[in-house]
C-alpha cells in the first residue's frame, strides 16, 4: 500500500522521522545478531515504493549479505534480490517454497499492520518462523502512539477500532478504514501474537523504540534456540 499524505504534518519531515527510527531499529538488531552468522537474508513485504530514504530501509543497509531474497504481494524492483516470490505472507507455503526461501535472517518492516485480521497476523508470524533459520525481526508502529504515520493524523487511531474506521470513512480515507489495509497493533496484541506460538524453537522478545518519550514502534525479535 503506498503511503499518502492526508495529514497535518509535512511529508519530508515524517519520512525523516521514520528513517531515524528505522536506523535505531537496525542498531537494536545489530546488537543482538552475530554478523558472521548471517549468510542469507529474506525481506517480507518489500514495497514497490523505493525512492524514499525510509523505504525498504533494512534491504538497503545489509550490503554485506550476498544472498538476499524477497517475498511480497507487490510488484517490486528486483535488482536488489537474488530471488523474488510474489505472494502474500499470510498464504499457505509449500515445502518447496519454504526450502527455497528459508534464510538465516528474516525481516518484515511495517507490514504486519497491513495483512488484515488478527488471524492473518498470527498466520504471518507462523510463516515467518517457518522461513527462519536463525533470526527474525518484525517491526510495527504502536497503535497507542499519538500520531498515526499512515494517515499523518493524531489521536483518532487510539479510539476503539470501529469508531476509528467510521471517522476515516467520514473524512474519505476509505482505504485506511478497511481492516485488510490497516489493522494497528499495540503491545498487548503483540504479546498475544507471541503467546500464540507454542512449542516453537525460538526465544521471542519485544523491543520498543521511543519518540518524544513515548513508544512509537514495537519490534518482535526471534532467535533460534540452539
Go through each PLM region and give its residues:
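Low-complexity, intrinsically disordered Gly/Pro/Thr-rich segments
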Residues: 71-73, 198-209
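Conserved class I S-adenosyl-L-methionine
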Residues: 135-163
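Short, glycine-/aromatic-enriched active-site segment of Class I SAM-dependent methyltransferases
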Residues: 150-154, 161-180
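Short alpha-helix
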Residues: 177-198
Amino acid at each position: 500500500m503506498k503511503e499518502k499524505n492526508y495529514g497535518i504534518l509535512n511529508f519530508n519531515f515524517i519520512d525523516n522521522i521514520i528513517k531515524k527510527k528505522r536506523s535505531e531499529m537496525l542498531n537494536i538488531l545489530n546488537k543482538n545478531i552475530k554478523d558472521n552468522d548471517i549468510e542469507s537474508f529474506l525481506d517480507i513485504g518489500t514495497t514497490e515504493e523505493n525512492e524514499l530514504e525510509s523505504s525498504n530501509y533494512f534491504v538497503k543497509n545489509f550490503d554485506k549479505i550476498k544472498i538476499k531474497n524477497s517475498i511480497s504481494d507487490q510488484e517490486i524492483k528486483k535488482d536488489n534480490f537474488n530471488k523474488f516470490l510474489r505472494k502474500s505472507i499470510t498464504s499457505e507455503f509449500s515445502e518447496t517454497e519454504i526450502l527455497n526461501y528459508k534464510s538465516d535472517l528474516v525481516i518484515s518492516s511495517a507490514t504486519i499492520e497491513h495483512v488484515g485480521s488478527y488471524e492473518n497476523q498470527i498466520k504471518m508470524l507462523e510463516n515467518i518462523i517457518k522461513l527462519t533459520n536463525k533470526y527474525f525481526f518484525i517491526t510495527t508502529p504502536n497503535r497507542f502512539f499519538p500520531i498515526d504515520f499512515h494517515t499523518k493524523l493524531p489521536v483518532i487511531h487510539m479510539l476503539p477500532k470501529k469508531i476509528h474506521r467510521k471517522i476515516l470513512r467520514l473524512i474519505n480515507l476509505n482505504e485506511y478504514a478497511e481492516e485488510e489495509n490497516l489493522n494497528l497493533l499495540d503491545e498487548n496484541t503483540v504479546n498475544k501474537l507471541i503467546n500464540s506460538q507454542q512449542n516453537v524453537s525460538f526465544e521471542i522478545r519485544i523491543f520498543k523504540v521511543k519518540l518524544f518519550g513515548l513508544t512509537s514502534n514495537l519490534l518482535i525479535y526471534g532467535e533460534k534456540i540452539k
